[in-house]
Amino acid sequence: IQKEMTVMFADIRNFTTLVERMDPKHNVDFLNSYLSYMEPEILAAGGFVDSYLGDGIMALFDSAPASGGTTALACGATAALGMLRALRAFNANHSARAGLQLQIGVGLNRGLVTLGTIGGADRLKCGVIGDTVNVASRLEGLTKRYGVPVLLTGSTQRALTPELRSRTRFLDRVRVAGHVEPMYPLAGPHLPCRVHDSAGC
């Protein structure tokens, strides 16, 4: 089945290095506590967690227009900003005690995905595949390089409400899967757009 959705990848930056000082049980407890702050923001924005990838999250948002003609919730931008707010709360409540200050990167891409049952005979799960997924993953990886917490593709940026779209600026283009995608950082309150002047921010 093919469907238009927004795919989110979110990952803790340098997680392996950060938790080297912890024992395995504390690592798991710390990670589960962090995820308990992130997941509600995804659910509140109309998305759902497809999978946990170690310290990473893959989430999906139905991109069908919501009531009032907006797809902001479906695009996951609201979730991304909520996750950044939740991260500040997590850092204040937990990370300081552990001597850590977490940072995350979030990539969002809207487009067609293929949904199906994936796996071998002994382990099957519903999953999504396609270029849309690959581009979202690539954007998440580029957030560290460009020094921004959230990166969107042009198709995602165009689907935002005017208010959210006003928080974006064109940054660069990235070649993925044989085509070029524009990238836009998303800045929220207390989250200035921190990119090179040549990018127009």
Task: Outline where the language-model segments fall.
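Catalytic strand-loop-helix junctions within cyclic-nucleotide turnover domains
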Residues: L60-T71, V106-C126, T143-Y146
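Catalytic NTP-binding/metal-coordinating core of nucleotidyl cyclase/transferase enzymes
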Residues: I1-T78, C126
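Nucleotide phosphate-binding site architecture
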Residues: T16, M58-A59, T114-L115, Q157-R158
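Cytosolic regulatory/linker segments at or just downstream of nucleotide-handling modules
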Residues: V113, T143-C201
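A structural signal for short, well-ordered beta-strand segments
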Residues: V7, I57, I104-R110, P185
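Acidic/histidine metal-binding catalytic segments
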Residues: L53-G54, A96-G107, P149-G154
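Alpha-helical scaffold within the catalytic cores of cyclic-nucleotide enzymes
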Residues: N32-G47, S63-V106, D131-K144, R165-S166
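A conserved hydrophobic position in a structured secondary element of the catalytic/binding core
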Residues: A10, R110, L152
